[in-house]
C-alpha cells in the first residue's frame, strides 16, 4: 500500500487537502483525482499543490466506521445546541473521572467553537480538559494522516443521496481519532458553501446540518484527556488506518 497526501494553498492560506491509502496500481489514477480536486476547489485556484507518495511499511489497521447519524436543523443556533449537548454528555464522564468541575465544560466547548469560527488552520486544534492548547503549532495544528475509507463503505455512503464525498472523507478521520485517545471531535468544513458539520464521539458520527453560516470559514478541534502529546501525534499522523 502507498500513502498519498495532497495539500493545496493560495498565498499561504489553506485551500484543500486529502489523504488516501492505495495499491501501487492505483497511484496514477488517484493522484490525478487529488490534483483535480485541488484545482477545482470552491475556495479558489491554489498557487501551490504538494502531492506526496510514500510506501506504507507498517501493518494496516482496519477499523469499523462510526455509525452515521444525521441531525436536521434549520438554524445555526439550534444546530450548535445539538452539538453542545452531544459534547457535554461525553465530556462530563471525563470531567468526573478526573475530578474536575463540570461547570467548566461550557467554557471548554465555547473555546472550541471560537477556534473553528476563526478558521485558517491547516490542521486540528487539540484542547485538554482544562482548555489548554496542546498542538505543537497553533497555526499548523495536527493533521490526521495515513487514512482512507474502504471502497465498499464509500459506495454505501454515496448511495445515500443526502451524503457526499465530504462524508466519505470525514467518517475516516472521525473514526480514526476516536480510536486514538481522542474524547470527541468538533468540525465544520473549510468549504465556504458547505454548512454541515459534525461531532464525533465513541457513540457515533453526528452529522449536523447548518452548524455554520454559508460563507463562513471552518475548523476542527479534538478534545483530549492525555497530555502525552508525542504519543498522540504519532498515532494520529503515522498509524495507517482503513475504515470499513
Swiss-Prot record:
Its cofactor is Mg(2+). Its EC number is 6.2.1.14. It is an enzyme of class 6 (ligase). GO terms for biological process: biotin biosynthetic process. It catalyses: heptanedioate + ATP + CoA = 6-carboxyhexanoyl-CoA + AMP + diphosphate. Pathway: Metabolic intermediate metabolism; pimeloyl-CoA biosynthesis; pimeloyl-CoA from pimelate: step 1/1. Keywords: ATP-binding, Biotin biosynthesis, Ligase, Magnesium, Nucleotide-binding. GO terms for molecular function: 6-carboxyhexanoate-CoA ligase activity; ATP binding; magnesium ion binding. Belongs to the BioW family. Homodimer. Catalyzes the transformation of pimelate into pimeloyl-CoA with concomitant hydrolysis of ATP to AMP. This is 6-carboxyhexanoate--CoA ligase. It comes from Methanococcus maripaludis (strain DSM 14266 / JCM 13030 / NBRC 101832 / S2 / LL).
